Amino acid sequence: MTTPKVINRSRREEILELAVELFAARGYHGVSMDDIGARAHITGPALYHHFKGGKEEMLAEALIPVSARLLAGGREHTAAHADDPRAALRALVTFHVDFALTSPAVIAVQLHELDRLPSEPRHRIRKLQRSYVEEWVGVLRRLRPELGDTDARVLAHAAFGLMNSTPFLGRDSLAERPRIAELLTEAALSALDPEHRSTP
């Protein structure tokens, strides 16, 4: 009895992934339900069976779970290294770099299309994002007590700017993913921790 639900959920996730790729490539307003349907090999009207709220529902469902997973992952890593802020910072950076390299389309949509959402889901996403940033701020302040909240927040956002550059690297960069991960990790850690030493 549960098999149809699993199939439906998988199909829904597949459609969401395709929609995000289209939103990232063409912009939210440059993509129609028919465009998404064509990419997913389903008629545009039939998409409303999966997403009754249309594109808005797709956009919200693509971004809210991602923001929630980032926050949950951030909390998990900071808790795992509660007694070692430098290890916590490395864990956070490694975690976010992995996300950035595996989800560049999601990042592009977050950066450029979030304001297309109605206020309720938009505010929910913003709240999750702010909480995620505060995980980084807490780690930075434990590592560098001389920093105030504002300074730590500025540094965290600067590091996000580095790590979230993956949408601009192009598809050819996928073959160089290990090297790009290393470069982004070292750049972020160097920006955040003056005492960071590159690993050999």
Model-derived segments and spans:
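Hydrophobic/aromatic-rich alpha-helical bundle segments in the mid-to-C-terminal region
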Residues: I107-L111, P121-R130, R141-A188, E195-P200
